A protein has these predicted regions:
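Short, hydrophobic beta-strand segments
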Residues: 100-108
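Terminal connector regions
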Residues: 110-139
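Surface-exposed binding patches on compact interaction domains or structured appendages
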Residues: 68-97
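Beta-sheet-dominated interaction scaffolds and their linkers
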Residues: 21-66, 134-143
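Buried hydrophobic-core signal for structured, non-transmembrane domains
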Residues: 59-65, 102, 116-121, 133
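Short, acidic/polar linear motifs in exposed loop/turn regions
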Residues: 66-69, 108, 124
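Bacterial N-terminal signal peptides
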Residues: 8-16
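Short, solvent-exposed loop/turn segments enriched in Ser/Thr/Gly
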Residues: 54-60, 107-117
């Protein structure tokens, strides 16, 4: 029994480095020093107080390819259908800026604070970035 326990522990310890190595993500798989780096001016836009009658609220996230390889946005998706997005589909050259523009339609939102995520996936060193829209929907005042 003691031999079996020793054998199991030895086997687990032998496989630990394999699991660690397999779990590492190499941002530069070719090892050639070229990689895209996506940097945003801000990752959160505070839309403030939105009245129920406000149909749409526009916003823009501005980023730059701070790497030395072309940047390709492979997936840009909001957390709800109340957000419509426009973003560049073509590769962004190193040093160039990009703009993710959108409109938030507040009609489907409940009154009170809200938080909506926008997931951006790309070939950058940080492959997944979460952008955030926050604000508060309030009822129209009765005058």
């Amino acid at each position: 029994m003691k031999t079996l326990a020793t054998l199991i522990i030895t086997f687990c310890l032998a496989l630990t480095p394999v699991g660690i190595i397999a779990g590492q993500r190499d941002a530069d798989p070719e090892g050639d020093g070229f990689e895209a780096k996506l940097k945003f001016e801000t990752r959160e836009i505070k839309l403030g107080d939105i009245h129920g009658s406000d149909a749409d609220r526009s916003f823009s996230f501005i980023g730059v390819n701070a790497g030395n390889a072309p940047l390709v946005l492979t997936y840009v998706h909001p957390s709800c259908n109340c957000v419509r997005l426009q973003y560049p589909r073509e590769p962004i050259a190193p040093g160039d800026t990009l703009r993710i523009q959108g409109r938030l339609n507040s009609h489907g939102l409940s009154y009170g604070p809200f938080r909506r995520d926008i997931i951006v996936r790309s070939n950058a060193a940080e492959p997944k970035i979460r952008l955030l829209l926050t604000g508060t929907v309030s009822p129209d005042s009765i005058d």
